[in-house]
């Protein structure tokens, strides 16, 4: 019997070339892939939404979002992903299917999405202008402020989008995309941001 060895690779392993791209001068956009995260989809079972909400509050210390928002704790981000469902984004193995399942037994169905999605952070003073070319959502801070979230699409690709805390006074937008579409969306964002100048990198830190 042949032995197989499987290596976990980023879905952007080929597409991401760290460095500069596009216009010269000060870069208006920072495009970063976040790697090695834990992501669990939580979906309330039929008639159990209230029980799931109570379990989430007890487990995370905050209420899970019931509207399009992202809320954070010291070690996790809960992201609305649809009616009676949300995503748990974290690092370090504290919030995985195995560790969360006991608290939500009977109230929610859990699905590990850690290797099914790519996480892309778009930041900088031209981040909003870059994404505005690709999204039908109004990303102005008055309409899409810190903590706002949406299940939407960019370039005909379904994504989960939310705005993180500002970094150095600049907006930070986070995108979760299915791994099979990540490379295509990455190139689309690069093309959109090229006129602004882009710094490209990957990181182990959540944005």
What are these regions (language model features)?
Residues 1-207:
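Basic, glycine/lysine-rich polyanion-binding surfaces/domains
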